[in-house]
From Swiss-Prot:
Probable serine/threonine-protein kinase. Involved in controlling centrosome splitting. Promotes separation of the centrosome outer cores. ATP binds at I112, G113, A114, G115, R116, F117, G118, E119, V120, K135. Keywords: ATP-binding, Cell cycle, Cell division, Cytoplasm, Cytoskeleton, Kinase, Nucleotide-binding, Serine/threonine-protein kinase, Transferase. Disruption phenotype: Conditional knockdown results in severe growth defects. Defects in centrosome outer core separation. No significant effects on the centrosome inner core splitting. It catalyses: L-seryl-[protein] + ATP = O-phospho-L-seryl-[protein] + ADP + H(+); L-threonyl-[protein] + ATP = O-phospho-L-threonyl-[protein] + ADP + H(+). Transmembrane segments: none annotated. It is found in: Cytoplasm, Cytoskeleton, Microtubule organizing center, Centrosome; Cytoplasm, Cytoskeleton, Spindle pole. This is Serine/threonine-protein kinase Nek1. The active site is at D240. The record marks S278, S282, T286 as: Putative phosphorylation site. One of its GO terms (molecular function) is protein serine kinase activity. Its EC number is 2.7.11.1. Phosphorylation status of the T-loop (amino acids 267-293) modulates kinase activity and subcellular localization of the protein.
Length: 1598
């Protein structure tokens, strides 16, 4: 009867029109009822007052006849505005009625369908007016097999009692007519097949949220059947699961809302009981839903996994509108297609849903998950559905029918009250329903009933779980007036089971829908009929149902463990997937007190900071006005000896997600609890959803030394032995006290969804290497929990989170704690990834040990919290926000309110910055580093990358916060001003343009770069670690040593041997900088800032030197194109010593007053050129950088991964940066260096040993104005050894919303992006002379093309309180790692400010254009090379528009390089037009050579590459070239038609409309590069099938 709806098929009512609306992403708190029903209508009236139901039948009621279950504390049914048909419930008559009398109890309404065995009718129970349906089957003409099948259906249905299974009520055998009446529940919303057809025909498909809701109900029903039903605990196989056998019933609370239907499994005519280990041996059901074991000729045995296969087919049909194998017309075709499997993933749906379908449609039934295992999948973790028990107990509160008038004794005001606890605006809310007792009915009012029963509904991109606050206490529920009982709380046992079955809820909060039992009121007991098996069986079945629910919940975790053990038996690897896209940048800023400042345990303070939310995806932008947040404080001053705890809730207030955590610290034998939890929003990924860690701070003699671990960790970490000591994770443990034994713990976790394994290990040492003052007075506890994605899975939204808590409590000497939480939300739609990191660190100082705390509270402590965000496109840096805080005895509330400055009771000791590069190659050092020189010391060439500098600054009077802690319209922070101010205010328009001499700078914005702790007696220690994006390397803070990469001797990132190589340790560099200029009061007249900077050098081998920079300011002068930059200055060195050079610094800056109308954009450019101090045997690096302040973001010019041309899968929004420089590593300075500076023209300078031809800086004005601000630089320290290298980078990064979106994510089709010719070559020679097997890797590439697209600027902007000023601030940092022990600067900052009080909508813009000339560089030619031509082409950079959008137009001529190189693993090769070219060169070391992907060009492009050797070392020795062909056996070529070139002074863009390129990536693409890291190539593999049928290229048309 599958062609009809209803329980056995029926047609939907004529009034039903719109099938599937969009599912709400958050389900109502009211659970799905065990039975469904409709409103009382004229056709379905209610019984009159006093009308007694007939007690002459044992037939149960209709679908809607039983009230919904009442949860403990969360009533499942708000009866405020809903009156359902009353279920007849009473004891049966002692005298049985005959068949005619039983049939006369029902009134036949109409026929709704017909099937193989009979007809289906809607009927009404005359006594209760409840709508039911019966299947009328004439068994006279049935064969014996069909009769057995009919009896089987009745026998199966009578034992099934589940909210998501069509309810069986009674059977009536009419022997006079030789027919059987099967009375069952009536599902009024039709079957799923018709809903799918109508949705895909008229509405474009079904929303994923609704699919998830239907599927989770079906899984609950199948889990109920497969785990065994009845007294004999026999499993039930449906054997005919398909959409037309899945029926939909109206929700009892929302009968007119088709989007909230309840899915019910029906038509068990082909079902069969199955013993625990038996098999069924018949092929029944629809062939399109048959599993592979059913289609095999010789194998027709199957078990419950066949139903799971059919469920996967149903999910696929809901997503696509057709069965997975609908193309098959014959049985052999069907077998072949089933053998090949369906086409997955289904586009437009999340990875989690596709993963569920892929696991259900596994050909091997042993690999398919069971129904219980499916409940652990990530896609269901936010789904709030839980099936309720079917029956109520007599102990539950009574209920009053809805809409009964007060005169009838059923006041309409007798409603359940809705209590909603909302964490924050826009965040997920918890709705609980408390059912009033019969005494409350009379006291309630209809108005309150209507208001309180409103459904709390919100929409977002996915489901999210409701959770209580971190403390586990929920807000009190609202209760109806009167002496009604409060809502009951579920037991701990029931919650523990529920949390196991549905991970995602916190262990201290009840599940959102914990169902209890309730019974109907005794006054209406006469209106109800009992089930067929009587009251005794009903109670027994009720207990059985609860027991089954507990067993099913516990089986979820057991299933995961079983899968884990099976996976372990199969010998699968426990190590992380090396190709997983784990590339990340982590910046950690740690503030630690001096040892002398340690004191007794004191009180702490908490400052709640806003967690910066990631960008909204498209759906969020459409449905949510923006991100909101709510911050709360909770102080707990328990006594003077215990540190004050705090509670922080920092929710992502995007609809449907929240994060909360508790922080606290205590003295010895006290417990510090740290917990965080998250509900994912967007596209979830596999991974455990929550962690809870409890670390006990106990004395040394205590036995509690356990580390609690939970969650799925894809990292194997070995923390340092002592957290605050600079010890490598891989160095031996420091000496420990003999009385304290070390302990270690390991944990392994498995994701129930992915069945992938991972492990983590934590080493814990009870004491550090410092002796304790007294026995038992010192202890340490370490707790770490990480929740991460499974290895190899793509990034999802807000998925990865980790928590690291470390404490060292003590009663007397010193106590400290630290915590770090990192979350990495990814944005697949935008091919970006962000990272949020919160760190807390404190030390409790003694009053007498620290002069800064004199007269202060001895319990003063410090806390610093940092949050950062990283975009994947800017792989070498990121944005960060930090907020540091040291109280001086005043209360938190007063300080926060006044924003008063405070003095740190201890000194900031160090800053540690760790960075993992995202180049995608297994490297010793950053891709920006040159290859090691043969003359370099062995320690350098060993690859122990990372260098350190130590600098000291004079004592400042006050603590200054990091500039990254500021954002518009944020909370106040301690400033350097003597006057407290809640917000930094803009100056009055009448304020002077320049501050008067001696004027106090107040209300200023902090404008510091780089340093986050300009505090008292600052001593900064900087250390940078480089890491591979893919494989464990020597310097990765996250991974242990790789057996191949670990050198002999155990060189560590913090090795003293490495630090001894830094000559600058012999001296110090100090810098003091004050930004005291007021902001401008008008866009075009007032100066922007004023800066005074004093920089000094103190070197052991040289005289002290100081230089001061004059105040610098610039203003806008619109309409004048011939202005030259102002504010330039050059400061000579103060002293020089033979053998040590203190190079001069040069800095120039000023406005770029261009544009025909003077848009008023805040512009400027800056050229910084400064050499660090150096001595012999020291590598020196000098770099000049140009940054356009109007470019909102930045990227490192030294990383080939970042230098992607426009349209080349750009991963960051947009940026522009130019940074040429010179890198040297020489043994001695036997000959004075040769340096030249020239301005205002293009020139080429060569010293005696080398020639350098950097790109030139363009003129700030177009046209015939001479080029200004050019810098060319040549340096030859030693004529005997050519050991200098040059690198220069230019580029503009633009996003491709519709284009190929990044090299570690899925590639996307290009819609309107113009084609961008590009030529790039990467050479990977074998490193014969390199140490430790590292090979040199040279890269030369350039780009050309055009791109014009509007997109959001992505800056933080806001209106300051108290005024209409509109400002914006952007800042970024880039870290560069040096493998040669360089002491040159390794990072730079980029800052854009537009703080002028412009009105909303005020446009701003800038324009930059550079010109150059062609010149040959014969000194760069090597053996086998033909000439190389390097030249700079034209470049246009412009932006205009309102604050929210920016327009960019970019054009650059390509590069022609006559070098034969291996394929590029970073992008698709392109051809470009002939003409002037510009070339770029960089080199870095790698573990092994790596072949790239296959690339080519269309016909019409001529190849011009000639075989040659590639040099990546500058010591005169050539490495062997790696000429490994690509996967297609081809060498990449690029060319261009001679006619495609257009040049002009205005740098017109050439016509590239006829250009295209082909991506040739064979199916064995991954196999071709299997030995090498492939995170950069994952996007090609994922997009292979999509790209097979179209011409796909970076920037090309689809």
């Amino acid at each position: 009867m599958e062609q009809f709806g209803g329980p056995s098929g029926f047609m939907p009512p004529a009034s039903y029109t719109a099938p599937l609306g969009k599912y709400p992403t958050k389900q109502p708190s009211a659970a799905y009822p065990s039975d469904g029903g409709r409103h009382a209508t004229k056709e379905n009236p209610r019984p009159a007052e006093g009308q007694a139901s007939r007690q002459s039948s044992s037939v149960p009621s209709a679908m809607a006849s039983k009230p919904i279950q009442d949860p403990e504390g969360h009533s499942a049914q708000p009866t405020s505005s809903y009156c359902r048909a009353q279920t007849p419930r009473s004891t049966p008559l002692p005298v049985a009625l005959d068949e005619e009398a039983r049939l006369s109890q029902y009134e036949v309404i109409r026929q709704i369908g017909a099937g193989r065995f009979g007809e289906v009718f809607i009927i009404r129970h005359k006594a209760t007016k409840a709508l039911l349906c019966w299947k009328l089957v004439f068994y006279k003409g049935l064969r014996e097999k069909e009769k057995k099948q009919l009896v089987s259906e009745v026998n199966v249905m009578r034992e099934l009692r589940h909210a998501n299974i069509v309810r069986y009520h009674d059977r009536i055998v009419c022997r006079s007519r030789q027919c059987l009446y099967i009375v069952m529940e009536y599902c009024d919303a039709g079957d799923l097949a018709k809903q799918i057809e109508a949705a895909h025909k008229h509405h474009g498909g079904i929303d994923q949220d609704r699919i998830v809701l239907v599927v989770v109900q079906l899984i609950h029903a199948l889990a109920y059947c497969h785990e065994g039903v009845g007294q004999e605990r026999r499993r039930v196989l449906h054997r005919d699961l398909k959409p037309c056998n899945i029926f939909l019933a109206s929700h009892p609370e929302y009968p007119d809302d088709s989007s909230r239907c309840i899915a019910k499994l029906g038509d068990f005519g082909l079902s069969r009981h199955l013993n625990m280990h038996s098999m069924a041996h018949s092929c029944v059901g629809t062939p399109y839903y048959w599993s592979p074991e059913l289609l095999e000729d010789g194998q027709k045995t199957y078990n419950v996994k066949s139903d799971m296969w059919a469920l996967g087919c149903v999910i696929y049909e809901m997503c696509t509108g057709k069965t997975p194998f609908a193309q098959a017309q014959t049985m052999p075709q069907l077998k072949e297609r089933v053998r090949c499997g369906p086409v997955l993933p289904v586009p437009g749906f999340s990875d989690s849903l596709n993963a569920l379908m892929a696991s259900l449609l596994q050909p091997n039934p042993n690999n398919r998950p069971s129904a219980l295992q499916c409940l652990g999948y990530t896609i269901f973790r936010g789904c709030s559905y839980t099936p309720p028990p079917l029956y109520r107990s007599s102990s539950a509160p009574s209920w009053t029918p809805r809409n009964a008038s007060p005169a009838r004794g059923s006041p309409s005001s007798a409603v359940s009250t809705v209590s909603t606890v909302t964490t924050s605006p826009g965040s997920s809310s918890r709705t609980s329903f408390s059912a009033p007792s019969s005494h409350d009915a009379a006291a309630s009012s209809p108005a309150s009933a209507s208001a309180s029963s409103r459904y709390q509904h919100q929409r977002s991109s996915s489901y999210s779980s409701d959770s209580a606050g971190p403390s586990g206490a929920s807000a009190p529920s609202q209760k109806a007036p009167g002496p009604g009982r409060p809502p009951e709380t579920p037991s701990r046992e029931s919650f523990d089971l529920a949390s196991k079955a549905r991970p995602g809820f916190f262990a201290e909060a009840p599940p959102p829908h914990a169902f209890a039992e309730a019974s109907p009121p005794e006054s209406h007991a006469s209106e109800f009929l009992p089930p067929a098996n009587g009251a005794a069986n009903e109670a027994r079945n009720e207990r059985t149902q609860r027991d089954r629910t507990r067993r099913a919940a516990s089986a979820t975790a057991a299933a995961a463990v079983s899968a884990f053990e099976r996976q372990q038996r199969e010998g699968r690897s426990m190590s992380p997937d090396p190709s997983a896209p784990l590339a990340s940048i982590e910046e950690e800023e740690e503030g630690e007190g001096d040892d002398a400042g340690c004191g007794s345990l004191g009180s702490g303070s908490g400052v709640t900071r806003r967690m910066p939310g990631a960008s909204l995806n498209r759906e969020d932008r459409r449905e949510a006005p923006g991100l909101r947040h709510a911050d709360t404080h909770k102080r707990d001053d328990r006594d003077g000896a215990i540190w004050t705890g705090r509670r922080e809730e920092a929710p992502f207030s995007r609809p449907g997600s929240e994060l909360a955590r508790d922080f606290g610290a205590a003295s010895q034998n006290k417990v510090d609890t740290s917990r965080f939890s998250g509900a994912s929003s967007g596209k979830p990924r596999p991974g455990n959803p929550q962690n809870e860690d409890r670390a006990s701070f106990a004395s040394d003699t205590s036995a509690r030394q356990t580390v609690y671990l939970s969650g799925l960790s894809r990292r194997c970490s070995e923390p340092p032995a002592a957290f605050h000591s600079a010890v490598s994770p891989w160095d031996p443990a420091p000496p420990r006290l003999s009385s304290a034994a070390s302990s270690s713990s390991s944990s392994r976790a498995v994701s129930p969804s992915s069945l992938r394994r991972a492990s983590s290990r934590e080493m814990k040492y009870p004491t550090d290497d410092r002796p304790a003052v007294a026995a038992g007075s010192s202890g340490v506890a370490l707790a770490r929990a990480e929740r991460g994605p499974e290895p190899g899975a793509p990034w999802g939204n807000e998925e990865t989170e980790g928590l690291h808590v470390h404490g060292r409590p003590s009663a007397a000497p010193a106590s400290s704690f630290s915590s770090e939480r990192t979350s990495r939300p990814g944005h697949p739609d935008e091919a970006r990834e962000s990272e949020h990191c919160f760190q807390g660190r404190g030390r409790f100082a003694e009053a007498e040990a620290s002069p800064a705390t004199e007269g202060k509270d001895p319990r003063d402590s410090g806390f610093e919290e940092r949050s950062g965000r990283r975009d994947e496109g800017r792989t070498d840096g990121g944005e960060a926000q930090s907020f540091g805080y040291w109280p001086n005895g005043r209360s938190d509330e007063a300080r926060d309110r006044l924003g008063a400055p405070s003095v740190s009771p201890f000194s900031s000791k160090r800053i540690t910055r760790r960075s993992s590069t995202a180049a995608g190659l297994s490297t010793y050092a950053s891709p920006s580093d040159p290859a090691p020189s043969a003359r370099a010391p062995a320690e350098w060439r060993r690859g122990a990358a990372g260098s350190s500098t130590v600098s000291a600054a004079g004592a400042c009077g006050r603590f200054l916060p990091s500039p990254r802690s500021w954002q518009g319209n944020e909370k106040s922070f301690p400033s350097s001003s003597d006057h407290p101010s809640a917000y930094p205010a803009l100056p009055h328009p009448a304020a002077p343009a320049y501050p008067e001499p001696g004027a106090q700078a107040s209300n200023q914005f902090p404008r510091r770069r780089q340093s986050a702790f300009p505090s008292v007696k600052r001593l900064d220690y900087e250390e940078e670690h480089a890491s591979s994006a893919c494989l464990p390397t020597l310097l990765s803070p996250r991974f242990p040593h790789h057996p191949v990469s670990r050198p002999a001797g155990g060189v560590s990132p913090r090795s003293s041997q490495r630090q001894a190589l830094a000559p600058t340790l012999a001296g110090m560099t100090f810098e003091r900088r004050l930004s005291a200029g007021p902001l401008s009061s008008a866009p075009f007249s007032a100066p922007q800032e004023r800066t005074t900077r004093l920089v000094g050098h103190r070197h052991a081998l040289a005289a002290d030197a100081e230089r001061a920079e004059a105040p610098f300011s610039h203003a806008f002068r619109p309409g004048h194109h011939d202005r030259t930059p102002v504010g330039a200055r050059r400061v000579p060195p103060r002293a020089e010593t033979p053998g040590v050079s203190l190079d001069p610094g040069f800095r120039t800056g000023g406005p770029l007053d261009r544009g025909p109308v003077g848009s008023g954009g805040l512009e400027g450019q800056s050229f910084d050129f400064a050499h660090p101090t150096h001595a012999s045997s020291e590598k020196k690096e000098a770099e000049t950088e140009w940054s356009n302040p109007t470019a909102p973001v930045f990227y490192s010019p030294r990383s080939p991964r970042n230098d992607l041309p426009p349209g080349d899968g750009a991963r960051s929004p947009y940026s522009a940066h130019l940074r040429p420089g010179v890198s040297e590593a020489c043994s001695s300075f036997s000959v004075p260096p040769t340096e030249r500076y020239e301005d205002d023209k293009n020139s080429h300078h060569a010293g005696s040993g080398g020639a350098f031809s950097p790109p030139t800086f363009g003129s700030p004005t177009p046209g015939p104005v001479p080029v200004g601000n050019e810098r060319t630089f040549g340096r030859n320290p030693s004529p005997a050894a050519t050991c200098a290298s040059f690198s220069a980078k230019t580029g503009l990064r633009t996003p491709a919303p519709n284009g190929l979106a990044g090299d570690s994510g899925a590639f996307r089709s290009t819609n309107s992006l113009q084609r961008t010719p590009m030529s790039r070559r990467v050479s990977a020679p074998f490193g014969a002379g390199s140490a430790e097997g590292a090979t040199a890797f040279g890269s030369r590439y350039a780009s050309s093309g055009s791109f014009s697209k509007k997109f959001p600027q992505g800056s933080s902007s806001g209106v300051h309180e108290g005024g209409g000023a509109f400002g914006r601030r952007q800042e970024g940092d880039v870290s560069r790692v040096d493998a040669h022990g360089s002491v040159s600067p390794r990072s730079f900052s980029f800052l854009q400010r537009s703080d002028a009080p412009l009105s909303r909508g005020q446009p701003e813009g800038s324009h930059f254009q550079k010109h150059g000339e062609t010149r040959a560089s014969p000194d760069f030619a090597r053996k086998g090379d033909s000439t190389q031509t390097h030249a700079s082409g034209g470049r246009d950079f412009s932006q205009s528009g309102p604050f929210e959008t920016q327009d960019f137009t970019f054009g650059e001529q390509p590069t022609r390089e006559t070098r034969h190189m291996a394929p590029s693993p970073r992008g698709i090769e392109r051809g470009g037009p002939q003409g002037s070219f510009v070339g770029h060169d960089t080199s870095f070391s790698v573990y092994a050579p790596r072949a790239g992907h296959a690339e080519g060009v269309e016909s019409g492009c001529s190849a011009f590459e000639a075989p040659s050797e590639s040099l990546s070392r500058r010591d005169g020795e050539a490495d062997r070239e790696n000429t490994v062909p690509n996967a297609n056996g081809q060498m990449p070529v690029s060319g261009m038609p001679a006619s495609k070139q257009t040049y002009g002074d205005d740098c017109d863009l050439y016509d590239n409309s006829a250009w295209t390129a082909q991506k040739h990536a064979p199916e064995n693409f991954h196999a071709a590069v299997a030995p090498y890291p492939s995170s950069l190539l994952t996007g090609f593999a994922e997009g292979q099938q999509k790209a097979a049928s179209r011409s796909s290229c970076l920037g090309g048309d689809r």
